[in-house]
């Protein structure tokens, strides 16, 4: 199973995904590169791809730094759970949902010259998003212990495992701490997705997709400061035993940096958003023109996004019954898996949605031709990536991640998971465009139905294969490491689902 690819990378999907402030010239570059004049599909997709590429590259640097300190093990599992636990907010209220329920309506209002109605609609959406997202975040903070227990029931008995020396840290207790920081961070990132929706509707693509760089940089700064404060020798930990208490403090510092990064990611977009809206009235009124229509579109999208979210949570739930490091291996592989989806799928899909929404319903042939051309563009770029990952994925993983506590065994297990994900890469990437094509036609039910079926099949296959592959280890397959302590490959079975 694989999580839904999202632009922001608190990943992630994405990955990401999701990521201090960018240089002051970024906003000016965005204004120059994405003028009010109608951008061509290719140039708009190029702007989106440029922003996503910058965010993903700095995200890879972030993951390499995290791998250096935590490797693939108990601490990295807690880090990944901290990002995934509040993903309900990100996936149900973030960019994917706003693409269906906000951008088409806002774009049509702007195209019809109803600038004041569009601004009032945007303000109402922001108000409603803020109320819902921060309410859920508050519940997440108050009931973090329940959230962790439900998502990772296999961690509840960690106190005994620490006593026996099986693992270095009580993952359950540490996860509760970081989840309480992760929920507010994700609520802020949801508001950042609203800003992205406004900018995309006005064809301002570059700034909105560069903004996650701020999140990633904030995490890197927090990691560096934390390492300086808590570790005796931050630059010489390869192969050495680092006190678990120090690594736990470092992990908490990382999530504090995530909150700061969320504020920065939203903040770099707000000045441009406010200039575009001109008349801006935040509210929580359902009587504002367009809001009820948006809510009607929102409900089936939430069902579809909820299905994807269930898939991601099933990965987390099932991985708790596998050996330590399974969740980290899945997440490290997903970072690479989501890169071509973001660059070649999401970039085209995001830039095409406002344009497809503007095409008259009477011009179906024009609509289909635009979708067909964009689909060909995506596959032309993705198919070579599939071949490259399968043939050279081990080298890619090694170059990007193998450092410090991240060793050769870790590289092999992440490569095997990446290869499993890669088998479905072309289909997943193309689905991003097709999903947005349905949204542009005001059809949010069809993608939701497809998502539910996809998740059901994925869960059944992944949970069965997980048990088969968990009997194998890296030592069994490639003879690397020690037979008694070699990393297991149960995560590969989950990825194949």
Which residues does each predicted region cover?
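Membrane-embedded alpha-helical bundles of multi-pass transporters/translocases
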Residues: 2-497
């Amino acid at each position: 199973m694989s999580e839904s690819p999202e632009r922001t990378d608190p990943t992630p999907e994405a990955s990401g995904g999701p990521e201090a402030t960018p240089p002051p010239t970024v906003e000016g570059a965005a204004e120059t590169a994405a003028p009010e004049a109608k951008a061509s599909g290719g140039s708009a997709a190029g702007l989106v791809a440029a922003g996503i590429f910058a965010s993903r590259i700095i995200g890879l640097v972030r993951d390499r730094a995290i791998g250096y300190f935590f490797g693939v093990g108990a601490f990295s599992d807690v880090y990944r759970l901290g990002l995934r636990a509040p993903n309900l907010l990100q996936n149900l209220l973030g960019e994917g949902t706003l693409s269906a329920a906000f951008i088409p309506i806002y774009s049509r209002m702007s195209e019809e010259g109803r600038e004041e109605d569009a601004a009032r609609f945007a303000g109402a959406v922001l108000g409603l998003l803020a109320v819902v997202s921060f309410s859920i975040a508050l519940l997440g903070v108050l009931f973090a212990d329940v959230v962790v227990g439900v998502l990772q029931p296999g961690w509840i008995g960690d106190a005994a495992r620490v006593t026996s020396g099986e693992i270095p840290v009580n993952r359950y207790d540490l996860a509760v701490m970081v989840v309480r920081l992760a929920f507010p961070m994700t609520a802020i990132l949801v508001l950042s997705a609203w800003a992205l929706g406004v900018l995309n509707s006005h064809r301002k693509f570059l700034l909105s997709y560069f903004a996650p760089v701020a999140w990633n940089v904030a995490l890197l700064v927090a990691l560096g400061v934390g390492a300086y404060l808590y570790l005796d020798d931050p630059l010489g930990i390869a192969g050495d035993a680092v006190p678990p208490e120090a690594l736990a403090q470092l992990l908490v510092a990382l999530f504090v940096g995530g909150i700061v990064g969320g504020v920065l990611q939203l903040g770099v977009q707000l000045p441009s958003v406010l200039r575009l809206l001109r008349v801006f009235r935040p509210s929580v009124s359902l009587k504002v023109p367009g809001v009820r229509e948006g809510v009607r579109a929102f409900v089936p999208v939430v069902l579809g996004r909820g299905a994807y979210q269930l898939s991601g949570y099933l990965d987390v739930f099932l991985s708790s019954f596998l050996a330590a490091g399974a969740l980290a291996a899945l997440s490290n592989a997903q970072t690479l898996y989501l890169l071509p989806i973001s660059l070649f799928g999401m970039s085209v899909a995001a830039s095409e949605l406002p344009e497809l929404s503007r095409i008259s319903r009477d011009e179906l042939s024009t609509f289909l031709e635009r979708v067909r051309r964009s689909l060909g563009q995506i596959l032309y770029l993705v198919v070579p990536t599939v071949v490259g990952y399968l043939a050279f994925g081990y080298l890619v993983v090694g170059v990007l991640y193998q450092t410090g506590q991240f060793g050769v065994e870790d590289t092999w297990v992440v490569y095997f998971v990446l290869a499993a994900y890669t088998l479905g890469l072309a289909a997943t990437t193309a689905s991003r465009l097709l999903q947005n094509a349905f949204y542009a036609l005001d059809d949010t039910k069809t993608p939701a139905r497809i998502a539910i079926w996809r998740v059901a099949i994925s869960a059944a296959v992944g949970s069965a294969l997980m048990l088969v592959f968990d009997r194998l280890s890296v030592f069994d397959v490639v003879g690397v490491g020690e037979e008694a302590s070699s990393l297991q490959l149960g995560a590969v079975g989950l990825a194949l689902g």
